[in-house]
């Protein structure tokens, strides 16, 4: 329920995506499960099929929320319409250390057709064709195949169905060459955030000609006291900085007291770091309070995660 509220909060009226007119609107199916499984119940496909049938669209794009990309889908649609397959899949060439065992890697021939796929199991190659699980599919064909899947005793999630369809239909493979972060773990999430401190990666993701729409907060600028010391960090608005901050991503309405130190960390909104407290290699969720003199310290390969709303009164060191 919390995730659904967050989605509504960010979409708002849908105006930025052309979804607030008389002739267009958005449909949001309410399906949520705490259980991680490759199979689903009948409600899962009832929601998807209702959306597809109401859409009246010729083509459908399915997106995966585990990859961070800023992709121009118009280019993908153009190639899909030019090559005329029933399925087009987007892939990225990635080094093996950035791929996890839940990712699908593709076998692609010289004409950019998908010949096969398998879950990543490691190997000797340095670079693999990792599927982003972004697909463009002809809608009538997709409805037909999903109705077949929904009728099975144990229907699979959409991504698994689409992976197999890409092979069965010799899908066209579109290579994405821009910035991509494959967020498959806490460490990968941590790295993706701190990547934004590198200007080259930042401008690859937030390209000036390809806007990223999100919720806007009009607040006062962040205040930096004379006692503050800031190096290579990004701040949102509304914060008060009296301490030391370096190599960190800082959200809105954060309060760093004098004598506090934050480095190599991701700080969510409304966090308070008291006098003399130290935070290193940590992900600190919304509304956390770190008491005076307390140390929260993870490592580069194992950052500490502090739960939303926690009050930290004792050291947490890894």
Region spans (language model):
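Left-handed beta-helix
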Residues: 140, 149-318
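Unchanged
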Residues: 1-195, 306
């Amino acid at each position: 329920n919390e995730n659904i509220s967050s989605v509504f909060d960010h979409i708002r009226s849908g105006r930025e995506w052309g979804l607030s007119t008389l002739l267009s609107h958005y449909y949001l199916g309410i399906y949520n499960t705490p259980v991680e499984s490759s199979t689903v119940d009948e409600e899962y496909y009832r929601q998807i099929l209702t959306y597809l049938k109401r859409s009246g669209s010729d083509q459908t794009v399915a997106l995966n929320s585990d990859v961070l990309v800023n992709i121009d889908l118009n280019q993908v649609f153009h190639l899909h319409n030019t090559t005329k397959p029933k399925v087009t899949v987007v892939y990225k060439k990635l080094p093996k250390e950035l791929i996890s065992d839940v990712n699908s890697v593709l076998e692609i021939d010289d004409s950019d057709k998908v010949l096969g796929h398998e879950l990543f199991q490691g190997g000797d190659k340095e670079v693999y064709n990792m599927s982003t699980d972004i697909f463009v599919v002809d809608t009538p064909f997709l409805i037909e195949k999903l109705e077949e899947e929904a009728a099975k005793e144990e229907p699979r999630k959409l991504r698994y169905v689409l992976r197999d369809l890409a092979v069965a239909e010799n899908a066209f493979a579109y290579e994405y060459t821009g910035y991509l972060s494959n967020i498959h773990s806490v460490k990968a999430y941590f790295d993706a955030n701190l990547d934004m401190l590198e200007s080259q990666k930042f401008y690859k993701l937030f390209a000036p000609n390809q806007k990223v729409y999100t919720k806007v907060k009009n607040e006062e600028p962040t205040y930096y006291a004379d006692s503050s010391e800031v190096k290579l960090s990004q701040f949102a608005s509304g914060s008060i900085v009296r301490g030391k901050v370096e190599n960190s991503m800082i959200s809105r309405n954060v309060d760093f007291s004098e004598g506090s130190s934050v480095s190599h960390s991701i700080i969510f909104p409304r966090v308070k770091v008291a006098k003399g407290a130290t935070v290193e290699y940590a992900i600190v969720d919304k509304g956390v309070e770190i008491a005076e003199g307390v140390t929260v310290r993870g490592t580069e390969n194992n950052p500490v995660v502090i739960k939303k709303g926690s009050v930290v009164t004792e050291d947490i060191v890894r």
